[in-house]
């Protein structure tokens, strides 16, 4: 199914104090257009290498986590990944590359069924809109979510990315 929605960006008041610059950007995104297509896909084992961050702020925009990670990468021409893990007692976000790299933390994801959102629009708004849609239309399960960020300007109106949200597999 393909969808186009005008959404009001409501996270501006929830942004932590240390993200004042990002908050100003978000407030400018008062009304954005997010275009997305959704399909259900079964993925096998996945492995990533990256930097992990833990904390309560991980339910909010994570742009501040990407800065140190991307600073250590040389002008990447490959996708980067954001992996959100919430095991109940702690929240972890991993900025990552596909595959293995001994200089970074390794993370492996078990096979799962995902609602894969192909998104077009500013990444910050697009990611949150995909979660909003998934909560209404799928039974989400307690597995890590994956954000796929191709190279490019993540806040451009024509930026394209994917979000993989784990869902209960229909039998």
Model-found features: residue ranges?
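A solvent-exposed interaction/effector surface
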Residues: 1-171
């Amino acid at each position: 199914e393909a969808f186009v929605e005008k959404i009001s960006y409501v996270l501006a008041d929830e942004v932590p104090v240390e993200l004042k610059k990002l908050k100003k950007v978000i407030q400018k995104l008062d009304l954005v257009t997010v275009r997305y297509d959704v399909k259900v896909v079964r993925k096998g084992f996945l492995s990533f290498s990256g930097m992990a961050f833990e904390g309560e702020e991980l339910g909010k925009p994570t742009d501040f986590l990407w800065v140190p990670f991307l600073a250590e990468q040389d002008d990447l021409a490959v996708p980067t990944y954001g992996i959100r893990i919430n095991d109940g007692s702690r929240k972890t976000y991993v900025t990552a590359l596909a595959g293995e790299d001994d200089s970074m933390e390794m993370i492996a994801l078990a096979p799962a069924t995902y609602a894969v959102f192909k998104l077009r629009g500013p990444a910050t708004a697009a990611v949150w809109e995909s979660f909003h849609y998934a909560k209404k239309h799928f039974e989400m399960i307690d597995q890590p979510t994956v954000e796929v960020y191709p190279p490019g300007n993540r806040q451009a109106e024509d930026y394209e990315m994917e979000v993989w949200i784990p869902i209960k597999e229909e039998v």
